[in-house]
Curated annotation (Swiss-Prot):
It catalyses: 4-O-demethylbarbatate + S-adenosyl-L-methionine = proatranorin I + S-adenosyl-L-homocysteine. Signal peptide: none annotated. It comes from Stereocaulon alpinum (Alpine snow lichen). S-adenosyl-L-methionine binds at residues 190-191, 217-218. Pathway: Secondary metabolite biosynthesis; terpenoid biosynthesis. PANTHER family: METHYLTRANSFERASE AUSD. The gene is atr3. This is O-methyltransferase atr3. The keyword Transferase applies.
């Protein structure tokens, strides 16, 4: 494939394969996803397309093998709503998000609150993340970056590509599209395919959004779905994602992310996560316990120094610690902040 700046927008051809990799009858051949390019894979790779289709099974190898964040609650109490991060209703809905739901999704103003509550209840049954319980998916994050206007320009005017990794409902994808980014150049992936399917319910765009979504496990090296995009992305977005890992696993995740990017200066990793005034390892204050790393700016810079040493590349980190909704709650550790970042390949 030639430069993405000169190629036509990627298209997805659906076909029926009852026994495909994901166990679903609706998939897209990666050779059509990125025309004329199969990334050197010997096996045929198929990326399940959730555009207007049913939800797909989760791709995971289990927390013992991958180091993915452990369950937040015992399986027998998975639907427990007596935890401090479960809110019965949103205290308020961010005006930007409300505008997206009313103008992009055409949901009447007086129906927005009940609509998001209904979607949240379904999502809670999938996996009770704090961001689900607190309705934090209603707080768009990608547009908080000072780089956001330039990002929209790259996608809209330069025909560049973006992968939202750990996209949940892909709410930030919808923000990009509403601001003029071509939806066919944007991809989304999450451990839970159900979340991406609920995104279509939340935004009511199943028949119009041309983005491609697929379930994936970033730490599963055998995941051919993700390998199908290696070397093809101009930007990878990590929204509320990296705080799920300890320091060593974070280095491993970021190293894997670099393989998704085009190997050239200007390729970009950007995102937001739970951070801390002092980067350290602490037990996370949830019933399952666990030891995860809370980054400050210096520790995030160390991650990318190690990534650079492992890959023979150089990266520039721009980051900031901020207060934000859902950060600094009473049940969280002292010093919790929102950590936003952009990491540029030099």
């Amino acid at each position: 494939m030639t430069s993405v700046d000169t190629m036509p927008p990627p298209m997805v051809r659906l076909e029926s394969q009852p026994d495909d990799l994901m166990g679903s009858s609706d998939v897209a051949d990666v050779s059509d996803l990125l025309p004329g390019h199969t990334n050197g894979l010997e096996d045929e790779v198929k990326i399940p397309a959730t555009n207007g289709l049913k939800s797909h099974p989760v791709v995971t190898t289990g927390t013992e093998k991958t180091g993915v964040m452990p369950p937040l609650q015992p399986e027998s109490k998975k639907n427990n709503k007596g935890v401090p991060w479960y809110h019965a209703s949103p205290n308020d809905i961010d005006p930007v998000t409300r505008g997206l739901l009313e103008n992009y999704s055409k949901i009447p103003s007086d129906q927005v609150q009940q609509h998001v509550i209904a979607i949240r209840e379904k999502a809670w049954d999938v996996y009770p993340y704090p961001c689900i319980g607190q309705f934090l998916f209603l707080n768009l994050t990608i547009n908080l970056s000072p780089y956001y206007p330039s990002l929209v320009s790259r996608l809209r005017d330069q025909n560049q590509t973006l992968l939202d990794l750990g996209c949940c409902f892909a709410q930030d994808v919808r923000k990009l599209v509403s601001d003029g980014a071509p939806s066919q150049n944007i991809y989304g992936a999450d451990l839970y395919g159900e979340f991406m399917d609920l995104g279509f319910e939340l935004f009511r765009d199943r028949k119009t959004l041309k983005s491609t979504f697929f379930p994936t496990d970033i730490l599963n090296e055998r995941d051919l779905l993700l390998k199908g995009l290696d070397g093809e992305m101009d930007v990878v977005y990590l929204g509320l994602f990296l705080h799920h890992f300890d320091f060593e696993t974070c280095v491993k995740v970021c190293t894997r992310v670099t393989r998704l990017l085009k190997p050239k200066p200007g390729s970009l990793v950007m995102g937001v996560q739970v951070g801390s005034l002092v980067g350290d390892t602490k037990p996370i204050p949830i019933p399952s316990g666990g030891i995860l790393w809370r980054h400050d700016i210096a520790s995030l810079e160390r991650v990318w120094e190690e990534v650079g040493a492992l890959t023979g590349t150089k990266w520039k980190v721009e980051a900031r610690l901020e207060r934000g909704k859902g950060f600094g709650e009473k049940w969280q550790l002292e010093g919790t902040r929102r950590l936003g970042f952009e990491v540029y390949r030099l």
